[in-house]
Amino acid sequence: VAVGDVRDSLAAFGERYLRKVFTAGEVSDCNGRNRVHSLAARFAAKEAVIKAFAEPDMPFPLREIEVTLDGPLPQLRLSGTVAERARHQGWVSSSLSLSHAECHAMAVVLVVCRQADSE
């Protein structure tokens, strides 16, 4: 994700952009020195989650994909229709890695699914 795109969205839409894309917890966690970079990394995580689904072209409410900092490593918290889709596809657990540089932020999501029943 281009950090400049997130910066431009914040400049153009402000709080409306934040409320549409991020949870209150994510916004609070990003209120530091590298705010735009941290928000861009969370946006990258949301994109990575969507791509991990077998049907990534379906609509996904971005606020139902949350990056939390409950411990030393970032975690994913899914809710609503996104959590239901994950259960339907057999998601058992996930791991998340975030990083950012001057111009870009990136995320990798690894999902473990239960083994499909053989017929």
Give the label of every model feature segment.
Residues V1-E119:
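Core catalytic alpha/beta fold that binds nucleotide/phospho-ligands
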